[in-house]
Regions:
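Intrinsic-disorder-linked linear interaction elements in eukaryotic regulatory proteins
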Residues: 1-350
Length: 350
């Protein structure tokens, strides 16, 4: 993408800073001409991470004009900047769910920068951006930077006691992940317990968001060698996702019956990757257990089959364990799955 940059020529005494590292810039984006970089490597990283999505959107926001200094212009720029925040947030979340942590950094940084422009420094509205940036650096192993970002997020929350359950849930989840990565397991369990509480208050006990906390807590107990607790937590996660996917599948099949030419997958690709990792981890654990329950293995395998089908990846369905075709009765959640063989999945996509 080096063709998208030009050497920076500025009047003497005028300096610009790099979009990624805030060091002195020597290059300029040739398309928008309002974004600057210290070198071609940072330009390329930013282009892949977020800039190609927002390049032209930055022009009116970063170009001073008589209109932009008037009240109507300021309001318009504020709305455009809020739109940028949402775009950057969605891109960062998508890349994180796909495990592309390095690519998520520019989007998370842009989200944070725009959030500061709109809401000011040290405000609770910056917390989602702090956590996105922390999650990206967590995946890259930059734990010192993660701790710093988490401190800033925690301080913003402490100053805003009125902030909602969703913010607290996300903060505790990220804190739990940090303590898990640093080996402080008791602290991690404390934060995951709080994560589950706040998530259940915001989304409900049966929510897939809430069950994410159970899965992360189970990972801690895996490290502590507590298979019985792990099995119990995994069962909760597996049943929640199976129920959710079964409902999505039923709705998708109904849509196919109304519109047989539909080719769009019914499940977001990034989320499919993330949920697939969760379910495969549970399946691997249950298959290795000496006290494994065939119904639990079948439940998880069937969930993976539904996930692949909903994501449009039918080729992976045939490679799942055949136990996914058994009839399963879920007495705890009162959900009954009857006669849904994998071959029926394939027939819908022919």
């Amino acid at each position: 993408m080096t063709s998208h940059i030009i050497p920076l020529a500025l009047p003497k005494g005028t300096e610009k800073v790099c979009e990624l590292c805030q060091k002195r810039a020597y290059l300029q984006c040739a398309r928008c001409r309002v974004t600057y970089y210290c070198d071609a490597e940072h330009q390329h990283s930013d282009w892949i991470g977020i800039h190609k999505r927002i390049c032209q959107l930055l022009i009116p926001i970063r170009t001073p004009s008589l209109f932009s200094m008037q009240r109507a212009g300021r309001i318009e720029n504020l709305l455009k900047t809020k739109e940028l925040i949402e775009i950057c947030r969605l891109v960062a979340e998508s890349k994180l769910s796909e495990g592309k942590h390095e690519e998520a950094v520019p989007a998370a940084q842009a989200c944070l920068r725009c959030s500061v422009d709109v809401y000011g420094p040290n405000t609770v509205q910056l917390v989602p951006a702090y956590l996105l940036l922390a999650d990206a650096n967590m995946g890259m192993g930059n734990l010192a930077l993660v701790a710093e970002l988490m401190s800033q997020a925690e301080w913003a929350v402490l100053k805003s006691p009125e902030c909602g359950y969703a913010v607290h849930h996300r903060l505790h989840r990220s804190m739990g992940c940090l303590h898990t990565a640093t080996g402080h397991f008791e602290a991690a369990l404390f934060h995951f317990a709080n994560d589950i509480y706040f998530a259940s208050e915001e989304y409900g006990l049966d929510s897939t968001v809430t069950c994410g906390g159970y899965f992360l807590m189970a990972d801690v107990f895996v490290k502590q060698g507590e298979p019985a607790i792990v099995h119990s937590l995994y069962k909760e996660v597996a049943e929640t996702w199976h129920s959710h996917l079964a409902k999505l599948l039923q709705s998708h099949i109904q849509n196919l019956q109304k519109n047989p030419d539909t080719t769009e997958p019914a499940f977001d690709k990034g989320q499919q990757v993330e949920v697939g990792k969760i379910l495969r981890s549970i399946l691997e654990f249950e298959q290795d257990e000496t006290r494994k329950e065939p119904a639990q293995v079948a439940l998880v395998a069937h969930s993976l089959a539904m996930l692949s089908y909903l994501g449009g990846d039918v080729t992976r369905v045939s490679h799942l364990p055949r136990s996914a075709e058994v009839n399963i009765r879920l007495t705890r959640s009162h959900v009954q799955l009857v006669n849904f063989p994998l071959r029926d999945c394939n027939s819908h996509n022919k």
